[in-house]
């Protein structure tokens, strides 16, 4: 073997050693990072499962889906966004401020309330079995009840299929109706008794500013999710809060059905 050939072998061996050491260091760093991250991921996965049934399967695949969608997460309580929307009508009266701080909500895009829970018997008997059917019954000529297209496990109020949504007179609400697939509102009766519903911009502003709810984390312009008008309503804890939530559901139907009772806000 010549001196040059020997040098070549030494160089190759040196480079191979460097590469092996680099690979070993990378594997070591990955192992350390995984050890540190695993407890957080495990807790986060358990939080995801605790949110109950939704559009994402209750397994690792569903968790991966919500983690990817979380990259598009939007701010949920700002008010300026409402004044940029074209709808200037309002169906809600002035609301009283909700008592106390806002409830803690999940960090996932599957939106749930984590504290300030109402009594389940009260929520099921008064909100699910009484208020929601009562509000929908006032609008049977325009709405019907069916399984939610967002949650898959909840009953929802829908605009009837026979109601046209391409009528120029319905602008700008018809775009919201299209994006929600005619769904107006649903309640998470199998979990925390919160609701999701569509509100006209000025009604959404009133609800958020008075502490009764917040936007969906994927709601906003340019986001692959529900429209900006899609709003999360905190669970009512007593009769007074239930009365406010009933007004909010009524306003949601008014907006989505283009009820002439809407008043333009200057």
From Swiss-Prot:
Which GO MF terms are attached to this record? oxidoreductase activity
Q: Give the record's membrane topology.
A: Single-pass membrane protein
Write down the chemical reaction(s) this protein catalyses.
Answer: 3-hydroxyhispidin + O2 = (E)-caffeoylpyruvate + hnu + CO2; 3-hydroxyhispidin + O2 = 4-[(E)-2-(3,4-dihydroxyphenyl)ethenyl]-1,7-dihydroxy-2,3,5-trioxabicyclo[2.2.2]oct-7-en-6-one
Chief place where the protein resides? membrane
Provide the transmembrane region boundaries.
Answer: 22-41
The keyword Cytoplasm belongs to this UniProt entry's keyword annotation: no
What EC identifiers does the entry list?
Answer: 1.-.-.-
What UniProt keywords are attached to this protein's entry?
Answer: Membrane, Oxidoreductase, Transmembrane, Transmembrane helix
Task: Tell me its applications.
Answer: The availability of a complete eukaryotic luciferin biosynthesis pathway provides several applications in biomedicine and bioengineering.
GO CC term (a single one): membrane
Localisation: Membrane
Q: Which Pfam families match?
A: Luciferase (PF17648)
Question: PANTHER family per the record?
Answer: AMINO ACID PERMEASE_ SLC12A DOMAIN-CONTAINING PROTEIN (PTHR38695:SF1)
Family under the similarity heading: Belongs to the fungal luciferase family.
The role this protein plays is: Luciferase; part of the gene cluster that mediates the fungal bioluminescence cycle. Uses the fungal luciferin 3-hydroxyhispidin as a substrate to produce an endoperoxide as a high-energy intermediate with decomposition that yields oxyluciferin (also known as caffeoylpyruvate) and light emission. The fungal bioluminescence cycle begins with the hispidin synthetase that catalyzes the formation of hispidin which is further hydroxylated by the hispidin-3-hydroxylase, yielding the fungal luciferin 3-hydroxyhispidin.
User: What name does UniProt use for this protein?
Assistant: Luciferase
The upper taxonomy is:
Eukaryota, Fungi, Dikarya, Basidiomycota, Agaricomycotina
């Amino acid at each position: 073997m010549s001196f040059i050939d020997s040098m070549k072998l030494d160089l190759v061996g040196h480079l191979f050693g460097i590469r092996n050491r680099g690979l070993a260091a990378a594997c070591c760093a990955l192992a350390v990072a995984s050890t540190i991250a695993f407890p957080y991921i495990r807790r986060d996965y358990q939080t995801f499962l605790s949110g109950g049934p939704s559009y994402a399967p209750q397994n690792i695949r569903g968790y991966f889906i919500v983690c990817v969608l979380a990259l598009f997460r939007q701010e949920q309580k700002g008010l300026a966004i409402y004044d940029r929307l074209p709808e200037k009508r309002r169906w809600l009266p002035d609301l009283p401020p909700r008592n106390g701080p806002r409830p803690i909500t999940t960090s996932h895009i599957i939106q749930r309330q984590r504290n300030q829970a109402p009594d389940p018997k009260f929520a099921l008997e008064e909100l699910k079995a009484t208020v929601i059917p009562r509000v929908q019954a006032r609008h049977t000529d325009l709405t019907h009840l069916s399984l939610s297209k967002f949650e898959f496990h909840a009953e929802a109020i829908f605009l009837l299929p026979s109601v046209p949504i391409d009528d120029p007179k319905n602008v700008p609400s018809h775009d919201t109706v299209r994006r929600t697939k005619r769904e107006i509102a649903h309640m998470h009766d199998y979990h925390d008794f919160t609701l999701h519903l569509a509100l006209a911009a000025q009604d959404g502003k009133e609800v958020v500013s008075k502490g009764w709810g917040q936007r969906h984390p994927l709601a906003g312009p340019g986001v692959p999710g529900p429209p900006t008008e899609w709003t999360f309503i905190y669970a009512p804890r007593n009769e007074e809060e239930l009365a406010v939530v009933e007004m909010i559901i009524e306003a949601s139907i008014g907006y989505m059905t283009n009820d002439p009772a809407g008043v333009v806000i200057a």
